[in-house]
Amino acid sequence: MSGLSTVPDNINFAREEDKVAQKWQDENTFQRSVELSKDRPHFTFYDGPPFATGLPHYGHMLTSTIKDVVGRWAHQNGHYVERRFGWDTHGLPVEYEIDKTLGISGPQDVMKMGIANYNNECRKIVMRYSGEWEKTMGRLGRWVDFKHDYKTLYPWFMESVWWAFSELHKKGLVYKGVKVMPFSTACSTPLSNFEAGQNYKDVVDPAVFVGFKLLDCPNRQLVAWTTTPWTLPSNLALVVHPDMLYVVTKDKTTGIEYVVLEERLGELKNDNLEVIEKLAGSQLKDLRYEPLFPYFAYMREERNAFRVLNDTFVTSDSGTGVVHQAPYFGEIDFQVCVANGVIAKDQKMICPVDESGKYTSEVPDYQGVYVKDADKLIIKRLKEMGNLVRQAEVKHSYPFCWRSDTPLLYKAVPSWFINVETLIPRLLANNDETYWVPAFVKEKRFANWLRDARDWAVSRNRFWGTPINLWVSEDGEEVVCVGSIAELEELSGQKITDLHRESVDDVTIPSRSGRGVLKRVSEVFDCWFESGSMPYAQNHYPFENRKIFEDNFPADFIAEGIDQTRGWFYTLLVLSTALFNKPPFKNLICNGLVLASDGAKMSKSKKNYPDPMLIVNKYGADALRLYLINSPVVRGENLRFREEGVRDLLKDVFLPWFNAYRFFVQNVQAYEHETGNVFDMNVHVASENVMDRWIESFTNSLVAFVRKEMDSYRLYAVVGPLTKFFDTLTNIYIRLNRKRVKGDNGLHEQHHALAALGRVLILIVRLMAPFTPFFCEYIWLNLKKVIGSTEESVHFLMLPKPDESLIDETVERRVEVMRNVIDLVRLVRDREGLAVKYPLKEMIVINRDSQFLEDVKSLESYILLELNVRKLTVSQDKQKYGITLKAEPNFKILGARLKGEQKKVADYLKNQITESELEKFLLEGKLTVLGHELSSEEVAVSYAAGSDQGHGYKTHSDAKTIVMIDTTEDESLIEEGLCREVTNRVQRLRKQAKLVSTDTAHVHIVVSPADSQLAKVVAAKLNDIVSATGTPIKLGSPPAAAKAPTATSKSAIKDSEVELWLFAEGDSFDGITVVDGSKKVRVHVKTEKEHLKGYADLLYHVRSALDLWNGKIALKNVDGSAVHPTVDVTSLVGQTLQLVR
């Protein structure tokens, strides 16, 4: 025999996955697959490094699934794919955790503790959750190498980062400057623009209208508007637009004069004002005003500060048209003030705010106060001084620190920069050379970000990171950028074993120009610089692996979330362009975000999403994988995560797939039992059966489609057809060929049907392996026996190629036509409450296309059988059957476009349009009504049956096809329907008893009332029911002395009640019986394949047998006591339990 193992009645997908995962681990399956492929062409993949300071979430699982699918696909498509995990280990995420734990409030606390001690604390936690990551990724089915990972803290990785920076320095792309930057006061460090763009929030801030008194006219005030009162102590200038019109207004009560932009006068909310003068902004230039605060009054003499400037950045859509300038707290302020000589780039900064966001001694009145807390104090003082014109609040979007979730300040910081702005043309050109899915993210979001790129501040005033490799003389004139450990050892004369701050801060380099010694600058690199360096740093390039890197750069593929357009994607491209003038990758999949079911961001504190591992343990990783990548999220859109979506995939995809596989194995075993011969699927004699030819053609066409789309990385296009395949397989092929597969049409036909089904199952298992690796492995380990394969894993196989000789577009078209007709007739049956078990006299199919009707007739026997109809008629003439066309206007779309004309157009469509106009519209897709050209989006066409069709015909249609069914009844049709109902009850009882086709049993049946039509039909048609079910049936209840039945049921059919008792032959049942009303379920505690592990497993089998997937269930003993969840299920053998819902 073929040696196929018996497939159990039910499956716990998660448990079977655990077994497969254990097998992979025990047999080193992933490592062996890599070893087997080492001589193949390389497919290079870069893995964006996560931080191990947090647990993996759905976003990580999504990107990991995408990476795994593409990696497996490339591997099984003939490539060697190094899948190496990497870790981000430096930077704010780590330091922020340590600061919270140790109560560190600023750099001074770190210096007291000592950098070595501080960094040692950081080193302890960087891999806190690495074990959980490895376990989760393994359980998700992601094949990735953790053993040979890379970490940004490895000295060899850091050395490559130094090399990269030294190359940029040689190219003249590194400079030191003062720049107003987003600053995290919680983390005491500046952030780059792309970091600041990651976490905007809507906040309410004070909005104050402040009067600045003119020196020459103290009664006249220029009114500026600001949402940052805390910056007012640092004010040095005001700006107005030179070409806009300003008004001088006078308060009729106080006599105070206010100057504002004419368009913004209403913002003062003062009805007591009169306009006394109008001035162009240029006329206000160089007017001098009194400083609000005395702290920097000396700047009037030093730099001619506290005067009015002109600039065109001033707008009329907000504020007052007068903009207050605190140049060290605003990027535009800084540029304007430098351009007008109010400040100089190289002067001492007027920035009286420290790294914690608190005022320094330069503002003694508020020294030590956090600036946001000082807003109220400053507003109070302005009021007391008579400078507060109006106080309000404004809701606006404001950036927060991506790590600490605290508001950022914009303040001037001396930093080391990479001159990105000079690279913009090359960045855009290199971006054009890459291929993105979806394309719009590359062409719009990312390209726009590149066009507006700013110089990158790569230095951070922190401790745990790769130190910036610059050694500078005390006067700043001599700078050495060290590019390697060896170079530092040579220049310093010291042995270097590590590159962290505690190891290199005290290393000095003698000056070559007599300037004493050079000391390292104190800053470390932005951790994004490190992750952006990973393509070469993970290989310790250029110190090692030079050929490996250069031969395989750029990467073939990367994938991360859409938020990385301003993160990793950006830094990869900047550094690759600057260093190699190449894009860093060829192909990219950019996924959207995974949100909670209500559309909110997933939050641990809100508990608004289910734990990922609970989902995996409940439904299996394959179901979660398929759910995530069969959604808009792989097209760059957002996904609202719903547990029901994962559950539905299990029900709609995996269970039909399992049942098809089980059906195949059962019938191969039955075939071998019947013939005594081994089933040989390799003996391929072309089948003449149209359904065999169709399913093989359909599957090979699917293979061709999937391969083509995967070549273009369009996962979103392939997963839908793959998941729908199983509905096609089970509800078309198996449903219409069940009797052939079971051998009812003879052994020759059975072999053809089994061979076709087997070939299709193996083909789809190989095709789906990268997407659902666990279940494909589970099936392969059994199915490989029928083809005599010795391959130990489906993942060692190459992906299938379509067999073009089996693709028959004609037969695929015909079956698609058949499906269309079947679906339309089913809709009529459902609408009219006509179960398929009850036969109908006639169905009529109307379509103008003769080819369509020919296709219908070619599969007439299947259509009639499936729909349980006696006669099929086709026609091109709808008038013959009283069918007319009817226009259905889309009022929403028409109303939006036609406005007042909509009513006339709709009236014409409803009451005046002719049949010929609608016929023409169906052909051409456009229609002119009252001078308006309408599209098929705006008008739909449906079919209507005339009033003369009331003689029993019911209709339904789509855009091109009409079906009509004769619903009139006669006795023979009713009797046949009743007979089918009973047959169905017996078959369901066999299933409930978990019998396979080779198991023998007999049934007793009682129909009440005894004189009902159903009782007479059962008596008359008993032999037909026995033949259809393969089960002997006896009229009457079982004798009193009979043993307990294997299964029982009681149900209603029409106006009768049917009670059935099934007795399995040779039954020595060692299981548990569960009763649910009139139904019984028997669960084996131990079978050849598995044994029941506990109470939860018992409930799973009960749910599966009774199709009870919703709601809670429990079990109770015959005495009414509850069965405890911790019970040893073996103690329940032989007992009958009651189901409780």
From Swiss-Prot:
GO molecular function: aminoacyl-tRNA deacylase activity; ATP binding; isoleucine-tRNA ligase activity; tRNA binding
Residues annotated to bind ATP: 604
Domain of life: Eukaryota
Record keywords: Aminoacyl-tRNA synthetase, ATP-binding, Cytoplasm, Ligase, Nucleotide-binding, Protein biosynthesis
CC terms in the record's Gene Ontology section: cytoplasm
InterPro entries tied to this protein: aa-tRNA-synth_I_CS, aa-tRNA-synth_Ia, Anticodon_Ile_ABEc, Ile-tRNA-ligase, Ile-tRNA-ligase_type2, M/V/L/I-tRNA-synth_anticd-bd, Rossmann-like_a/b/a_fold, tRNAsynth_Ia_anticodon-bd
One Pfam family named in its UniProt record: DUF5915
Renumbered ranges of motif 'HIGH' region: 50-60
Similarity field: Belongs to the class-I aminoacyl-tRNA synthetase family.
Single Gene Ontology BP annotation: isoleucyl-tRNA aminoacylation
Disulfide-bond pairs as recorded: none
Gene this chain is encoded by: iars-1
Catalytic reactions on record: tRNA(Ile) + L-isoleucine + ATP = L-isoleucyl-tRNA(Ile) + AMP + diphosphate
Protease in keyword set: no
Keyword Metal-binding: no
EC number annotated for this UniProt entry: 6.1.1.5
Subcellular localization, as worded in the UniProt entry: Cytoplasm
Name of this protein: Isoleucine--tRNA ligase, cytoplasmic
Motif ('KMSKS' region): 601-605
